[in-house]
From Swiss-Prot:
Official protein name in the record: Acylphosphatase
Entry keyword set: Hydrolase
The enzyme's E.C. designation: 3.6.1.7
Domain of life (superkingdom): Bacteria
Residues of the active site: R23, N41
């Protein structure tokens, strides 16, 4: 796979996304898609997601972030391309 076929993004997910298994569910979906990165709670109530992998797989994860698990109520997902960072080795819940 060529490097240009990979995508590295950071996403910030707003809404009712803490205390609803959002991070663990994100990890399960990411692992199924073979996407590397992390999901972590932020002090302001959002969840930050770092994702690296095949462009199509990362796009599928981003689509899933807009819905999340059943108990979540997602109001906004902002994404930004990541450049110059070393790709992660796995997918972690922080």
């Amino acid at each position: 796979m060529k490097v240009q076929d990979k995508q590295h993004i950071r996403a910030w997910v707003s809404g009712k996304v803490q205390g609803v298994w959002y991070r663990n569910s994100t990890r399960q979906v990411a692992e199924r898609l073979h996407v590397l990165g992390y999901a972590k709670n932020l002090p302001d109530g959002r969840v930050e997601v770092l994702a690296y992998g095949d462009t199509e797989a990362v796009n599928q994860l981003i689509d899933w972030l807009h819905d999340g698990p059943e108990a979540a109520i997602v109001t906004e997902v902002k994404t930004k391309q990541v450049e110059g960072e070393t790709p992660p080795l796995g997918f972690e819940v922080c």
